[in-house]
Amino acid sequence: MELSALTAVSPVDGRYGSKTIALRSIFSEFGLLKYRTIVEIRWLQKLAATAEIAEVPAFSAEANQFLDAIAANFNEADALRIKEIERTTNHDVKAVEYFLKEKVAAMPELHAVNEFIHFACTSEDINNTSHALMLKEARDTVILPEIRNVIDAIRKLAEEYRDIPLLSRTHGQPASPSTMGKEMANVAYRMERQYKQIANVEILAKINGAVGNYNAHLSAYPTVDWHKFSEEFITESLGVDWNPYTTQIEPHDYIAELFEAVARFNTILIDFDRDVWGYIALGHFKQRTIAGEIGSSTMPHKVNPIDFENSEGNLGLANAVFTHLAQKLPISRWQRDLTDSTVLRNLGVGVGYAIIAYTSTLKGISKLEVNRDALLAELDHNWEVLAEPIQTVMRRYGIEKPYEKLKELTRGKRVDGEAMRQFIDGLALPAEEKTRLKAMTPASYIGYAIELTDKL
């Protein structure tokens, strides 16, 4: 069977492949080979730009342009050639080195220094830097923009529904009212915090040899300040943050930090998906139907909240992958073992499930239509929620056992507006307070909900 959306083992590349297409050039085998090629080229250029390394003379503009073009124009044919070389070497990083030696053979200036490709590097020097570039691009060009889309959509709901009253539920039971907009604002605020934390994670990399001490570097060029050289290469040539203290491998703590931050965002989104699912079940939201769609194979009337359910399921898968990556990657025996290698090939899997989920949530949000009449009817059926403000005012004016009196009137009972007004009339309260309390309804008892939403 040829690999296609129909034959792919994983739905990330199969059924949902159209939603994850932006990740292919980043997290695929092609992506890894592309980043390895970029790192090797930038390393050679850095060596040539260092006067103390006389054996690699400063490159001409043409030579640098030649190398830059290899990096910028890396394509599937290049990746296939590397894989062809790997069939002989049985070593994926060495195959990239040999591929570049083939490429530079066309330019005598570069061919003369081809043994400085991969100079003093261990494979992990190339791999960890490639993963850093991979994760930086994924975070900055895919993950954060998609998260921003979700947050902005929820912010829009907050603005649109800022003044639509909602019966709150604590422990599933009627509680003091809010507004639908304020509940959306609560979610958006939580998500904004996680967005900032994801954006602020330092993407770390190292290039310091087989055990992190520049042993090979110093043996060849003992007068070069390799520690400084390494920092400049990581921060300037590659544009990521430098980790100066490592073993053979960059310890991957930052990957754990990044994915744990994304997982926290995902957990908040699961909470949102479930709440909206519940609001749909209660009739607080209606879902706009799409012509031709079928909700059930046997019940023609069904309009199911499938987008929020799909999102919740995929977020669970994403977080399961992220959790394993965060727990496993920072652990490596002594100066390194190879258990991280196969795990690192799955960086895109968790991200893929997350992107699928974000897309589904956005689709679900686009179908939502608030059912104002149902919300108001529910509030009008739960006048007992005004027991809280009444007993609180009673406390202010020193009325004995206010809580207990309201408990006797309302706990486990349905009371209407007239019953509440009669109770208020019987209280020893100033006339203006009685008037204010009797004018209050469940729909108007929303505190600062609107103001807080507007301040988001």
Curated annotation (Swiss-Prot):
GO terms for molecular function: N6-(1,2-dicarboxyethyl)AMP AMP-lyase (fumarate-forming) activity. It catalyses: N(6)-(1,2-dicarboxyethyl)-AMP = fumarate + AMP; (2S)-2-[5-amino-1-(5-phospho-beta-D-ribosyl)imidazole-4-carboxamido]succinate = 5-amino-1-(5-phospho-beta-D-ribosyl)imidazole-4-carboxamide + fumarate; (2S)-2-amino-2'-deoxyadenylo-succinate = dZMP + fumarate. Its EC number is 4.3.2.2. Keywords: Lyase, Purine biosynthesis. Pathway: Purine metabolism; AMP biosynthesis via de novo pathway; AMP from IMP: step 2/2; Purine metabolism; IMP biosynthesis via de novo pathway; 5-amino-1-(5-phospho-D-ribosyl)imidazole-4-carboxamide from 5-amino-1-(5-phospho-D-ribosyl)imidazole-4-carboxylate: step 2/2; Purine metabolism. N(6)-(1,2-dicarboxyethyl)-AMP binds at residues 15-16, 90-92, 122-123, 248, 297, 302-304, 310, 336, 341-345. The active site is at 171 (proton donor/acceptor), 296 (proton donor/acceptor). It is an enzyme of class 4 (lyase). GO terms for cellular component: cytosol. Disruption phenotype: A reduction in the expression of purB leads to a reduction in the efficiency of infection by a Vibrio phage. GO terms for biological process: 'de novo' AMP biosynthetic process; 'de novo' IMP biosynthetic process. Catalyzes two reactions in de novo purine nucleotide biosynthesis. Catalyzes the breakdown of 5-aminoimidazole- (N-succinylocarboxamide) ribotide (SAICAR or 2-[5-amino-1-(5-phospho-beta-D-ribosyl)imidazole-4-carboxamido]succinate) to 5-aminoimidazole-4-carboxamide ribotide (AICAR or 5-amino-1-(5-phospho-beta-D-ribosyl)imidazole-4-carboxamide) and fumarate, and of adenylosuccinate (ADS or N(6)-(1,2-dicarboxyethyl)-AMP) to adenosine monophosphate (AMP) and fumarate. This is Adenylosuccinate lyase. The gene is purB.
